[in-house]
């Protein structure tokens, strides 16, 4: 099985609305690996790794997010395996500190 890895930047009203927790919980439930964090510019950044179809579905869900969020834009880029190293040891999916 080939692993697809995508870096996702989500802009809009996505901080202070539970977006990171929602993304981590939803991604883990789908069997994805990766991480999510707030950025100082008000966006949320995530790394999603797993089967291509599952990653694509998660990216689609990111365009809506939790009910309190208002997503204006989702930017998706390819990422390398080394980006997964930002996760905390022993975790499949981590909520990282703000960058």
From Swiss-Prot:
EC number, as in UniProt: 3.6.1.7
Keyword annotations from UniProtKB, A to Z: Hydrolase
Catalytic reaction list: an acyl phosphate + H2O = a carboxylate + phosphate + H(+)
Domain of life according to the entry: Bacteria
Pfam families reported for this sequence: Acylphosphatase (PF00708)
Membrane spanning residue stretches: none
Coiled-coil annotated residue ranges, if any: none
Entry GO MF terms: acylphosphatase activity
List of catalytic residues: 20, 38
Domain Acylphosphatase-like: 5-97
Family listed: Belongs to the acylphosphatase family.
UniProt cross-references to PANTHER family, sorted A to Z: ACYLPHOSPHATASE
Name by which UniProt lists this protein: Acylphosphatase
Taxonomic placement: Bacteria, Pseudomonadati, Pseudomonadota, Alphaproteobacteria, Hyphomicrobiales
This protein's encoding gene: acyP
């Amino acid at each position: 099985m080939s692993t697809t890895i995508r870096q996702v930047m989500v802009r809009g009203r996505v901080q202070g609305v539970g977006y990171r927790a929602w993304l981590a919980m939803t991604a883990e439930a789908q069997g994805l690996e990766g991480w999510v964090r707030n950025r100082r510019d008000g966006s949320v950044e995530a790394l999603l790794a797993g089967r291509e179809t599952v990653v694509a579905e998660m990216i689609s869900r990111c365009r809506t997010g939790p009910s309190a969020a208002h997503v204006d834009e989702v930017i998706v880029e390819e990422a390398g395996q080394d980006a997964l190293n930002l996760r905390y040891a022993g975790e499949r999916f981590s909520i990282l500190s703000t960058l």
